[in-house]
Amino acid sequence: MSQYTEKEPAAMDQESGKAVWPKPAGGYQTITGRRYGRRHAYVSFKPCMTRHERSLGRAGDDYEVLELDDVPKENSSGSSPLDQVDSSLPSEPIFEKSETEIPTCGSALNQTTESSQSFVAVHHSEEGRDTLGSSTNLHNHSEGEYIPGACSASSVQNGIALVHTDSYDPDGKHGEDNDHLQLSAEVVEGSRYQESLGNTVFELENREAEAYTGLSPPVPSFNCEVRDEFEELDSVPLVKSSAGDTEFVHQNSQEIQRSSQDEMVSTKQQNNTSQERQTEHSPEDAACGPGHICSEQNTNDREKNHGSSPEQVVRPKVRKLISSSQVDQETGFNRHEAKQRSVQRWREALEVEESGSDDLLIKCEEYDGEHDCMFLDPPYSRVITQRETENNQMTSESGATAGRQEVDNTFWNGCGDYYQLYDKDEDSSECSDGEWSASLPHRFSGTEKDQSSSDESWETLPGKDENEPELQSDSSGPEEENQELSLQEGEQTSLEEGEIPWLQYNEVNESSSDEGNEPANEFAQPAFMLDGNNNLEDDSSVSEDLDVDWSLFDGFADGLGVAEAISYVDPQFLTYMALEERLAQAMETALAHLESLAVDVEVANPPASKESIDGLPETLVLEDHTAIGQEQCCPICCSEYIKDDIATELPCHHFFHKPCVSIWLQKSGTCPVCRRHFPPAVIEASAAPSSEPDPDAPPSNDSIAEAP
């Protein structure tokens, strides 16, 4: 059996500035190579097989040897499914991935694995055939530097670490064909139980693990706890493997040939006794049976592991598994610190609130790195601030777990109270422009605060001065304030006496604030605005105050504009507007027609002469109206004929009151009914004299008088 007893000069030069690591008394076999033109590492695991352990007998050394037994050589071209697991497997999972870190530097591939089992690593390479020794202890006696890294603790039961090896080595030397894999395993101290596994084969092929399992009957469960964190590893030397540093032992003329396909080396570990094994991060002796591989596991020293925990460093392309116990511990510390900061922050906020500050309070509670923020108005924030302060004080005294539940309950109750009040208060018309902007988040209203008037304060917010003592002393304060706000809202939304419900008049409240923007008006529904004097508050003044500002329709003259503008107006109001528009148009048309008629009368129909008017026959109206025929009333004055009235008849045989027709003929020489010219006898006489009496001429007064 060959052993490395000296350190190479090159390694001595590189490690001169670092602590000397005790060299193991044996070696391990690595087979490195390239596959598919890419540098790829293949790792197979199996628990060590039965062999009597060899005590080193050294004082101060607590590590024990790995026991190896017959390792069957298997060649697998494909992956085997996980359903081959024997039914005798305990209820715990077959394996759990523990913390594994594989930093790469140059041609060295170092790996630290926290696990409860001992492993055998096989590294395939292009170097044709390597022999290995059996029934001897092989140790790779070399020193290497470990790239700094931090591993988080994990609790693994029946745990076997699976190595995810990157196919590319970013810092590697392309001229080298050999990469070396070193596994460092740690088993927890004394009082831990270890479970024996049977013929379990784990194969990591192309980053996929498969288990070939034939388990022995279940034994006492093994609870493997690894250390929380490694020490700062910059100065801690670990194993550096190279092709020249590995020495193999030829025994029994057995050889293992590298196959072009995936190779799998299985190891079995069997512990029939209840002995407890401790494997520290120190050089270990490994025993190898005939034709089998013995793997050296180089780990850190126990004393060095008890050092201060370094800050975790995130490595690329390395999977890290953090145990739930460590996560709970860290989150507990974070929550406790966050609650302490929250207590201090809310105390300061409470002092600012009591000093009369009008700024909004921003409530931010840190839970597991997340921020739950809520913007509060001063009257409501006072309640939640006091509650949060009391609960946070209780939290700091009682603990992080109970305090968190109370803080959560108080926080969400405060959210419900605040948003319930906020929803009821945002529709209130009593909230002026300045108050609206003050209720906005602080980061949005900060630029507008300088523009607000000096007399703007929180006193205008309903319920502040009256409810402030109740809110601080009594837990039922928000409910009372909620009732008062709802009553005030009902009074604000109720219609004033005499106000028309379907036509709302919006007045601009110029005295409330000097700000130019009016956020509250953005939520108002579009409607027709009347003049400042037309409030329409009295029903009796509706007919007098309906002077609508028609200039508002100028921008909505066509199509969709009118539809959008009047879509929110009551139909009765639209009907009235349409009727008024029609009446106005009809009046304009009638006046124009009358003006045209007046001009025509003056030009075409000159007044009748006084002689012709005096020459009209007069008829005395009798009781039976036989003298005037069927006429019952005068067409000019529209009054009925009564007894002893004097009527006259025009040549067109239309009867009128003589005074009425005389006035008409003085203005126009036509019949008011048929527009026939008067006097026709004069016109006919001038045109053609006729000896025959005119049948249309009215009868003489004598004949009328003699008729009765």
From Swiss-Prot:
It is found in: Cytoplasm; Cell membrane; Endoplasmic reticulum membrane; Golgi apparatus membrane. One of its GO terms (biological process) is proteasome-mediated ubiquitin-dependent protein catabolic process. The modification N-acetylserine is found at residue 2. Residues 699-708 have a biased composition (Low complexity). Its main location: cytoplasm. CDD domains: RING-H2_PJA1_2. It catalyses: S-ubiquitinyl-[E2 ubiquitin-conjugating enzyme]-L-cysteine + [acceptor protein]-L-lysine = [E2 ubiquitin-conjugating enzyme]-L-cysteine + N(6)-ubiquitinyl-[acceptor protein]-L-lysine. Its EC number is 2.3.2.27. It is a peripheral membrane protein. The modification Phosphoserine is found at residues 196, 253, 309, 323, 342, 432. It is an enzyme of class 2 (transferase). Residues 550-570 are annotated as: Mediates interaction with TBC1D31. A zinc finger (RING-type) spans 634-675. The modification Phosphothreonine is found at residues 246, 389. Residues 1-10 have a biased composition (Basic and acidic residues). Residues 467-483 have a biased composition (Acidic residues). Binds ubiquitin-conjugating enzymes (E2s). In vitro, interacts with the ubiquitin-conjugating enzyme, UBE2D2. The phosphorylated form interacts with PRKAR1A, PRKAR2A and PRKAR2B. Binds the catalytic subunits of cAMP-dependent protein kinase. Interacts with MFHAS1. Interacts with TBC1D31; the interaction is direct and recruits PJA2 to centrosomes. This is E3 ubiquitin-protein ligase Praja-2. It comes from Homo sapiens (Human).
